[in-house]
């Protein structure tokens, strides 16, 4: 026990020393801008990231003057173009433009980029930055340039009086920005250190980017507030006076913004938000989680009848990131007026708060000229930037140390075995001690930045204590290895949460000091009256139905077979369809129950997000309309992959249009593959070779397997549940004969594929059940096959490994001609028309509209805006898929794999196919039964059920 106290005391002293060395000035209501960036801590994670780059060049001074860069070279795909009377260079896929600059002496510069873009796409513009032909640090490989967006027209209401989300439009305007990390771990633009002499700077970008000039900028110092006031006095500017002098701008009335995700939202929790209504939806505030990433900005137009110096008060709320202050840069007419308006801190506020910018009880004054002024609020990490950078490095170090430990102990160590970790990893004690000290220091810095000890600082302190325990006694590590892995996840989640800077704004007001601000939350009796009205309104609200119109011949009913968020988006978008076609649409959210509704005569007209196995089952009972009989069918199906209609075809009729199409991809950790000198496997034999290397180091490979359930057997189909369809197709087999009357699981191809599939688990010990997200993040599973939808989950939930993983083509089977067959099945959802629909022509028009490119792009964009990257739409519309937020490199590999996708037919009774194959698999893997016997047994059972089903339906 005494030894433990000594260790903790030493670590606490070290953390205090580190804190003194690296903690920025405590954040007050008016943090001052500083040029210094904290570089004093030892970097122990990646050696090629921006943090390490800053450390190496910490003593390099800022440049004395700016430099213009001269264009010297461009790739052949780049063309000259004029936009708004300015010349630029239009990029196509993977284009480069190179500039030359002469540097007088060694210094660091910020890179200013002038750019515009075409309007054919709505994605942010990815680019890479190279200096002298090399990427200077990891973050420079994956950067983004933002577009400019605005609301398209004034807010409109639906038939019930609810405000609708305004359509977002992309504006084609030139911008000049400084290169920075879009992930938001740094506040300031990148520092590019250049030696004296000639250098080249290359921008590598993709489709739609229009590049203007590059400028190497110097570090610009903002004046202090006192210096600004002195300048105002010199200009003769006067403070406005009078209790009735104020200019209020509602937060929802934006001018322009950086992201289409930022749109008005509704708050009915407070009577004082304006405008408000206890019954209908009023989109009366803006921000929150949709305005949380560093670099996101919103601008407003403020009309000032009188020029002068105004106070600025913002009515805001920050109740999403508990206990955390957030920061914003505030621009007046394109400029941050003084250092105090950079990284302006908005303290944690669970309730709406009137926040007057100022210090020591005195407000700040800023100048507005007569007429229109542009006010911009930009999200920034503020004082958290250095902490985020350091904790990001610590997460990388924890991951690295964990992987090194499991190479010795495995992921399930024997707690009674002495692994001699201090001999196998000589610096392990020092590494854990340093981790503990740095985590404790980060916890203290965070508490200082927020002004209080929040749960976020407590999390870091708890992890620091465990690291101290391991440093004190390495024999505690095997027993605590699971806790260590959990700590890595905790720190990674901490990073993901703390980089968010959510802020909601109801309105902001420029005013004279004498102006009396209204209450942020209303009076007691106002709140009581509003709450009572809200309570009684709940009795008349139907939260499942979004019915806007009376039922009739010109009205169709659409069911959305997913969530309420998706249904709300469909409903809002359907109003545009009604405007265009004059057909009314009522939308309901319903999960399941379609067969029952059909039998009861209460079926809808159209169903969105119908599960893969449902259309053929319903069509076999004459419940669906044959879409191939409608005009324009061939043109509509041209939007999809060639065989996308196969799962929805029955007896020469087609009974659904595909909405989504998902298939398997291979995911791998590029950093671990580089460390271990591994190549991405192209075939299954190569995958087994990689697996052998990983398993020798106590890592593993993940292959998809989902235990069958009753609903899964009926709904999900067989295409991408597990690896068997992939292997079967690659081995030259098929599930069914050409007449679709029997299975072909008695073929040699089917048996060989089945043996290969089961042997992954019986001979090579691949895990059947695992948490892919967690294991991939920690590096335990650096290679895995998963649905392409996993891309969005990793992008949203694993920021600490950003840039350290990629998608690749599926492993394949070599062919006699030397090619590799990477065939695989697919899954997805569809849109169907019920045969009971009275106005089938109207339903067909709706289905055509909903599956067309622009509608799918709008739907996918709104979905991702609302729910994040994890909800990215895998649209079956090929053009729409290309216009969603994928990079060119990602699209290239996704398109390449899609060309190998072979859709598998769905049959009445097909649920027995997946169930029986799964039973055979489990018998072999769990009970060590013979593969041939079990597969033949499954084949006979399936064929009997298919025959029984045909007789029943005939």
Kindly give the residue locations of the regions a language model identified.
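Extracytoplasmic
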Residues: 23-515, 826
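Extracytoplasmic/periplasmic substrate-recognition and gating elements
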Residues: 105, 306, 798-871, 899-903, ...
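Hinge/lid segment of periplasmic solute-binding proteins
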Residues: 539, 543-548, 612-665, 688, ...
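Short, well-ordered beta-strand elements
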Residues: 551-563, 583-588, 606, 655, ...
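Extracytoplasmic "Venus flytrap"/periplasmic binding protein-like
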Residues: 573-643, 647, 671-682, 782-783, ...
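Extracytoplasmic/periplasmic solute-binding protein
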Residues: 650-659, 664, 688-742, 749-750, ...
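Glycine-centered hinge/linker elements that transmit conformational signals in sensory
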Residues: 739-769
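Long, aromatic- and glycine/proline-rich binding clefts that accommodate carbohydrate-like moieties
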Residues: 810-812, 861-919, 923, 951
């Amino acid at each position: 026990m005494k030894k433990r106290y000594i260790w903790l005391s030493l670590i606490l002293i070290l953390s205090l020393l580190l804190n003194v060395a690296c903690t920025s000035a405590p954040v007050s209501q008016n943090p001052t801008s500083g040029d210094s960036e904290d570089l004093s801590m030892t970097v122990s994670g990646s050696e090629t990231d921006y943090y390490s780059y800053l450390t190496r060049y910490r003593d390099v001074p800022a440049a004395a003057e700016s430099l213009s860069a001269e264009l010297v070279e461009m790739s052949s795909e780049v063309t000259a173009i004029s936009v708004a009377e300015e010349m630029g260079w239009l990029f196509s896929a993977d284009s480069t433009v190179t500039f030359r600059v002469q540097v007088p002496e060694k210094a660091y510069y910020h890179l200013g980029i002038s750019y515009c873009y075409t309007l054919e796409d709505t994605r942010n513009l990815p680019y890479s930055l190279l200096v002298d032909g090399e990427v200077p640090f990891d973050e420079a490989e994956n950067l983004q340039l933002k577009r400019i967006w605005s609301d398209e027209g004034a807010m409109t209401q639906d038939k019930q009086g609810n405000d609708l989300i305004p359509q977002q439009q992309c504006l084609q305007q030139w911008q000049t920005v400084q290169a920075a990390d879009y992930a938001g771990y740094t506040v300031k633009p990148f520092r590019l250190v250049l030696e004296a002499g000639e250098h080249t700077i290359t921008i590598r970008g993709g489709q739609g980017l229009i590049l203007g000039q590059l400028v190497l900028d110097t570090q610009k110092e903002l004046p202090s507030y006192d210096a600004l006031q002195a300048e105002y006095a010199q200009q003769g500017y006067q403070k406005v006076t009078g209790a009735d002098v104020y200019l209020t701008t509602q937060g929802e009335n934006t001018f322009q913004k950086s992201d289409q995700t930022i749109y008005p939202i509704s708050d009915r929790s407070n009577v004082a938000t304006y405008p408000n209504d206890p019954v209908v939806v009023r989109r009366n505030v803006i921000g929150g989680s949709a305005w949380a990433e560093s670099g996101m900005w919103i601008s407003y137009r403020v009309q000032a009848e009188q020029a002068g110096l105004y106070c600025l008060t913002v009515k805001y709320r920050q109740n999403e990131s508990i206990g955390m202050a957030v920061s914003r840069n505030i621009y007046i007419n394109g400029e941050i007026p003084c250092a105090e308006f950079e990284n302006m801190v908005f303290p944690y506020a669970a309730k709406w708060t009137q926040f007057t910018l100022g210090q020591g009880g005195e407000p700040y004054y800023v100048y507005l000229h007569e007429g229109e002024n542009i006010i911009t609020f930009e999200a920034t990490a503020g004082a958290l930037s250095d902490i985020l950078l350091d904790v990001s490095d610590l997460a990388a170090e924890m991951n690295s140390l964990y992987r090194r430990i499991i190479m010795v102990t495995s992921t399930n160590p024997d707690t009674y075995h002495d692994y001699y970790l201090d001999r196998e990893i000589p610096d392990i004690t020092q590494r854990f001690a340093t981790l503990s000290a740095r985590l404790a220091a980060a916890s203290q810095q965070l508490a200082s930045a927020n002004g209080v000890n929040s749960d976020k600082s407590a999390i870091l302190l708890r992890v620091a204590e465990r690291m101290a325990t391991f440093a004190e006694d390495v024999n505690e590590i095997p027993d605590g290895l699971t806790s260590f892995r959990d700590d890595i996840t905790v720190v990674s989640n901490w990073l993901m949460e703390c980089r968010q800077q959510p802020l909601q704004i109801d309105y902001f007001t420029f005013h004279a000091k004498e102006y009396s601000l209204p209450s942020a939350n209303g009076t007691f009796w106002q709140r009581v009256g509003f709450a009572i009205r809200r309570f009684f309104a709940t009795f008349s609200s139907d939260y499942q139905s979004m019915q806007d119109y009376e039922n009739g011949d010109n009205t169709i009913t659409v069911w959305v077979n997913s969530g309420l968020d998706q249904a709300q988006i469909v409903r809002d978008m359907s109003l545009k369809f009604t405007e265009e076609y004059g057909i009314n649409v009522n939308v309901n959210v319903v999960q399941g129950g379609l067969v029952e509704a059909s039998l009861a005569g209460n079926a809808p007209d159209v169903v969105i997000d119908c599960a893969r196995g449902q259309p053929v089952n319903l069509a076999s009972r004459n419940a669906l309309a044959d879409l191939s009989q409608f005009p324009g069918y061939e043109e509509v199906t041209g939007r999809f992959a060639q065989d996308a209609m196969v799962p929805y075809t029955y007896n020469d009729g087609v009974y659904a249009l595909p909405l989504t199409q998902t298939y398997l991809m291979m995911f791998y950790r590029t950093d671990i593959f580089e460390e271990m000198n591994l190549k991405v496997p192209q075939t299954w034999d190569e995958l087994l070779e990689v697996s052998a290397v990983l398993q020798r180091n106590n890592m593993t490979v993940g292959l998809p397997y989902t235990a069958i359930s009753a609903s899964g057997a009926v709904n999900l189909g067989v295409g991408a549940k597990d690896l068997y369809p992939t292997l079967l197709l690659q081995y030259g087999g098929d599930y069914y004969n050409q007449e679709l009357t029997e299975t072909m699981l008695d073929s040699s191809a089917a048996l060989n594929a089945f043996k290969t599939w089961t042997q992954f688990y019986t001979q090579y010990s691949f895990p059947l059940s695992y948490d892919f997200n967690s294991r991939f993040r920690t590096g335990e599973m650096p290679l895995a096959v998963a649905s392409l939808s996993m891309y969005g989950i990793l992008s949203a939930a694993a920021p600490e490994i950003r840039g350290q993983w990629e998608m690749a083509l599926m492993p394949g089977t070599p062919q006699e001609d030397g090619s590799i067959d990477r065939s695989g099945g697919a899954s997805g959802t569809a849109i169907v028309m019920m045969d009971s629909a009275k106005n089938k022509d109207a339903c067909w028009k709706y289905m055509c509209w909903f599956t067309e490119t622009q509608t799918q792009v709008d739907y996918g964009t709104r979905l991702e805006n609302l729910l994040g990257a994890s909800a990215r739409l895998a649209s079956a519309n090929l053009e729409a898929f290309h216009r969603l937020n994928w990079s060119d490199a990602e699209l290239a590999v996704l398109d390449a794999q899609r060309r190998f996708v072979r859709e598998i037919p769905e049959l009445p009774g097909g649920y027995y196919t997946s169930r029986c194959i799964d039973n055979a698999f489990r018998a072999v893997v769990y009970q060590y039964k013979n593969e041939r016997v079990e597969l033949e047994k499954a084949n006979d059972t399936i064929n009997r059920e298919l025959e029984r089903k045909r007789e029943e339906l005939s």
